[in-house]
UniProtKB/Swiss-Prot annotation:
This is Protein RER1. It comes from Saccharomyces pastorianus (Lager yeast). Its main location: Golgi. Keywords: Golgi apparatus, Membrane, Transmembrane, Transmembrane helix. GO terms for biological process: protein retention in ER lumen; retrograde vesicle-mediated transport, Golgi to endoplasmic reticulum. InterPro entries: Rer1. The gene is RER1. Involved in the retrieval of endoplasmic reticulum membrane proteins from the early Golgi compartment. Required for correct localization of SEC12, SEC71 and SEC63 in the endoplasmic reticulum. The keyword DNA repair does not apply. Disulfide bonds: none annotated. It is found in: Golgi apparatus membrane. The keyword Transmembrane helix applies. The chain crosses the membrane at residues 43-59, 62-82, 139-161. Pfam families: Rer1. One of its GO terms (cellular component) is endoplasmic reticulum.
Amino acid sequence: MDYDSPDPMNGASSNALIAKMNSAKLLYQHYLDKVTPHAKQRWAVLGGLLCLFMVRITMAEGWYVICYGLGLFLLNQFLAFLTPKFDMSLQQDEENNELEAGEKSEEFRPFIRRLPEFKFWYNSIRATVISLVLSLFSIFDIPVFWPILLMYFVLLFFLTMRRQIQHMMKYRYIPLDIGKKKYSHPSN
């Protein structure tokens, strides 16, 4: 028996499996590309999934640790969404050096996010679906006193958001499009 040569039947089934997986990946990417321009609908679906998850947690009266973990993950993603990609304090140090040298420029610098909107939505959808799936198995229902988790989360939320708002005020940037002037193409 020759062990060096691959089994032709095994190779054919392996190639068929790889072809099916590649086809599924392409189909998945195709649908992701189709939903990309529809931001309002994407976020509405995420809101619906989060409501479904909260109803599931409330009705089942369990899986509070999974809910807490999802909340922390979404908070982390939201902070990355609000945070600029480049550290403002380093840029301010460079500007101070320019001021001393007399080279201050009022050049416009756009706000570039650390986490783009689509990736924020995509990561949030994946985390919510995973949390919904985990809430189907009783092994993940760890007994815990949920008011403590809620208090921890609320405290963490307020402390991190206060720090983020102070950072936004200190370096004078607005990460959201609310109140910003929108330019449109003139219609003929």
